[in-house]
Amino acid sequence: NSFVTRTNTCGELRSAHVGQKVTLYGWVQYQRQGLFLVLRDFQGLTQVIIPQDEAHSHVKELLCTAPLESVVRVTGTVSPRPPGQQNPKMPTGDIEVKAETAEILNSCKKLPFEIKDFIKKSEALRMQFRYLDLRSSRLQSNLRLRSGLVMRMREYLCNLHGFVDVETPTLFKRTPGGAKEFLVPSREAGKFYSLPQSPQQFKQLLMVGGLDRYFQVARCYRDEGSRPDRQPEFTQIDIEMSFVDQAGIQRLIEGLLQHSWPEERGSIMTPFPSMTYEEALAEYGTDKPDTRFGMKIVDISDVLRGSNIHFVQNALSYPHGSIRAICIPQGMRYLTNKDLESLKESAKSQFNQEMMEIICRPDGSWKSLLTKFLGEKEKSELTQVLNMQEDDVVLLAAGEHKQVCSALGALRLLSANLLEAAGLALRDPTAFHFLWVVDFPLFLPKAENPTELESAHHPFTAPHPSDASLLYSDPTKVRSQHYDLVLNGNEVGGGSIRIHSAEQQRFVLEKVLKEDSEVLSHLIEALELGAPPHGGIALGLDRLISLIVDAPSIRDVIAFPKSFRGRDLMGNAPDYVTPEELEPYHIQVSWPLEEKEAKKN
């Protein structure tokens, strides 16, 4: 209560304060029949007794007529609540404040919605009146937890490990492959700044500058259009170090998270387990596995290799063909026929992948189209390798390895959702399973032209030391020194050891990616002037906090988020500007026809 005229907050009064005269400020949350009201501030609630005697009639009138959510000041004496009227659900439930004087500091007009966590509001309405939504205890708690976590991260990095907090520019230039960058016009005709997707180049240049250890709570920008649960501006904990290897960065992040982790969420165990990209794809069908539950993908190619099933033999005749399956525990008991059909339909529509099912009946017999093609030996081997129990359901896919694994990985998650919706506890919502995923490919074929390559992450990632020679002979086979941090099936961080050789960086840009290296001449020149080996990582702060507090959306951990279409519904941004305002930037708007007509009308 330093620097302010209140004596206490609304959440701190206890029995020990009985008899004290206090001054409270807050919002009127509730008022009952002219007898008492509940005053709320950032810390909690206090029950205020409205005086009934003639001497305080003006106080009674003022407090009885104050609309809900009005801001008031109340001075009074702390008293114990009468026997039987204590409220164990409130931290201040043993006391009440008997009002002696009061003042309405600001009256509130009719609210667009009630400020109570249990009352459902449309998200659009919450976003439009975000300053009201922020009064809810849930958002208050989320933002304060976020603030505390960032403070402990600063303490760990700067005070304990010598990192330097540096602000990097947000006005820069477009980078190769930076198609998702926001452009900012300049007064030089035809020239634009770009808002960086991350401080990547600047943090590398800080290492060239000898800063050794850099850290920033960085604002980043990405123009991705309409994407649910993505924000056009977001925050990352950005880190770079000189003279470090992959293991060093990983140990740093494990220590950072352990130090800053909120006490009320339990402790996290380190070191985090690690898995290669290939292992993650083969066992979970994704590079961000949720390891809180089993149902791993199992390779059954060898079991069925000798069978005369046409689609099996057809799949295995291809170089990367495989037969894989997942076993859904108690699937027969918890999933309906409609559920199974929806799973197969998802595989078909999303991955163009057919699925076969095997249902293990309670008597041990199978219900499947495959039964007539399989001998007892193959059935026994499948039962063993898939660990099939009665009432389990197996989903089986045959085809190209990556496609089969990706489809089964998606069905694994969909099945888990269906099982939990039907009442089977599968994933512990209070558990936090961290995982490092390593050894990603350095390059991937472009979706629009598979004969050309693009960076799997970004063009500054160094090749794996074991694969360095392959960079010049067969870049498609090169693994990278990139590492992702995954939490409960969500990517919460990503980083890499960087290329610190100008020659190698130029080769990657020009020969492998077919990009104009001149655009990055400032970085390549810096690498020629004594760049140390270096690497780093960025943690997605919004995503991390949303997982810690189990928020349904990252919008619930950001003070003023954009809608999923990238709009600010409160301030109505983005907005139109006049031709006169555009003139200094040498820009004219070319209106789509329908908008032209709308503006005319």
Q: What is each of the regions a protein language model found here?
A:
Residues 1-601:
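Class II aminoacyl-tRNA synthetase catalytic cores and aaRS-like
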